[in-house]
Amino acid sequence: MTGRHSPHRQTSPSPRPVEKMPRFQREHGASHRYTPMGKRPAAPANTGSHRGALLGRLNGDPERKGEFTAVSKLLKSRGYIPEARTALIEWVEKEGARRGGFEVMCGSILLPGHDESGRAIDDIFRDMSRSVRGEVASPIDELLFRVGNLLEVYVETTTGKPVPAKGLWGVVQVESTVTGIPKMIHVCLDRSLGVGYKCSFAKLWKKTIEELLGTGVGTTNPHCWFTRTIHSDAIQASFDGLNMIFELFGGRVRTGRVSPEGERRVFHTRCLGDDSFNALFAATVHDPTVSRAVFEARVRTVQTSYPAWYTFGDMWTPAPNNVGWVTTPEGSWCYDIRVRDLYNDPNKMSVTPAAAAPPGVPKPEHGEELEADPWKPSSTIGSPAPNLCALYTSGDSVELHAPLLPL
């Protein structure tokens, strides 16, 4: 996130604000030692780009002013990032909001266990995966594509208007096993579209899954509960060439990493209505005995690098060289970003190397043993684990592998 910085005038220093207790200390108790990542940057000087001056210019536009205030508060709650504030100011001054509200309509679709003949749906998907050759899309890619089209048809037929030409308006997420067998589909729509739940959605979903599988599945109504409306921090804020989604599916990555049956789960996400730069923030809970985790991103088109962000306590910090580092009082975690280009080389998974670490952070050794088994714990860390990380992605289809931690 970059933006032009206006020259700042010198002002008298303001009293240093009293920092709140870091979130993990509030949740785990104040007995945990806290080593801050660094000084929180000071507020920008009172120039024409200052927040107060900008709000004054937005007094005649309550909608844009409210949008700026809401997103600004959200950014502040995540930790003060000067680059984000600059980009936010430029966005408000130039374009304003392209998102309609904080409310989202969301729900889930549980894939049926068997078709009408009694054959297991898992077996059908497994056979489809084995038959995938060359340019043929995998079952998960097919689901992302077809459900995305389903939502577009549903929105347009329900509202009588086309989906927005710019900006994110919906998200589809396929939850699968680590072997690629789809289990559930999670969907989310911006409530500003004016879409409500209708029985036609279940009918569209039934037709979609039957066309994909080539067999009847009976009634799908009991498997679909696309009916929830939530007022959430899961919002989209559109900057110039940059769109951010905050914690949209974070809870599912966190709580659904391991299914009730003990299966590890993978989350495949497609953003609808936006082919620019998207940021999917995924909440995770880490095993403190694992000092290393790998997130895999599978994208349609590799357009740009993949910087990772992380939080420790209440502060967001950009990670260098596309590798997320988290320093704790007793050690550090390292997140590698793995990228697969589906168009140019679908079989090759490139790993972004861990180059320079932040000042004071020791660089983990990358030995042959680690490359062969990246999930093997290399040390024991007794401090609280970081509770949120993020992965920037480019393209319309993203596959996020939650860390494979010991069950």
Curated annotation (Swiss-Prot):
Domain of life assignment: Viruses
Q: Where is this region: Disordered?
A: 1-62, 350-379
Query: Biased-composition ranges for Basic and acidic residues?
Result: 17-30
* Protein name (database record): Uncharacterized protein ORF2
Gene behind the chain: ORF2
